[in-house]
């Protein structure tokens, strides 16, 4: 059973009190939420509900918006893909920051903040579409990306784990070279350590197609046939025939 959207096991009591009271609409609480974002970045936690509350305050009070806090929230949202977290956060930002053309093109092009938002949106698209090798290539292609993820402790490791989770849902066996690219692990030793210690998977070096990584069977990657049957009672045909005569009349 999934966790409720507005719940977070690591949420401090004072943040929970704000979210469940009228103070969540008080502009003075923005500094409290901003400090909480810093805490999430340092402690590798993510509280989507609290972050959305802060972005909503920014929406109502644009003069309070802190670009660095916003980019940190979006960067943290990347570490919990696949989920609607990034899209929900993005939807609360000003229209000129959105990753599509706007009427105010000049303003969009001249803003470092807007460029940062659009670069993060690009990373989100690559992750959500399972273009993992392209994600790492893009992330490593520009120093701005390094600056954007610098405040988020363990960003690469967190994303790597999420990618591994998705791979585990779709594969029972995968070529080691492919997985190296998807996880951006640039040596076979690093890959073997990650998949065995973090994922508890197996490495088979004696396969006919080279080294492969074997994923244990789970409810997502297990191949099984599904037979569906529907029972149609006689009374259902009676209703259909009766309606046909009623419409004709």
UniProtKB/Swiss-Prot annotation:
Superkingdom field: Eukaryota
Subcellular location: Cytoplasm
Residues covered by the PCI domain: 46-222
Major localization class: cytoplasm
GO MF term list: ribosome binding; RNA binding; translation initiation factor activity
Cysteine pairings via disulfide bonds: none
InterPro entries: ARM-type_fold (IPR016024), CSN8_PSD8_EIF3K (IPR033464), eIF3k (IPR009374), PCI_dom (IPR000717), Transl_init_fac_sub12_N_euk (IPR016020), WH-like_DNA-bd_sf (IPR036388), WH_DNA-bd_sf (IPR036390)
GO biological process, one term: regulation of translational initiation
A GO CC term assigned to this protein in UniProt: eukaryotic 48S preinitiation complex
UniProt keywords, alphabetically: Cytoplasm, Initiation factor, Protein biosynthesis
HAMAP family named in the record: eIF3k
Entry protein name: Eukaryotic translation initiation factor 3 subunit K
Species this chain originates from: Neosartorya fischeri (strain ATCC 1020 / DSM 3700 / CBS 544.65 / FGSC A1164 / JCM 1740 / NRRL 181 / WB 181) (Aspergillus fischerianus)
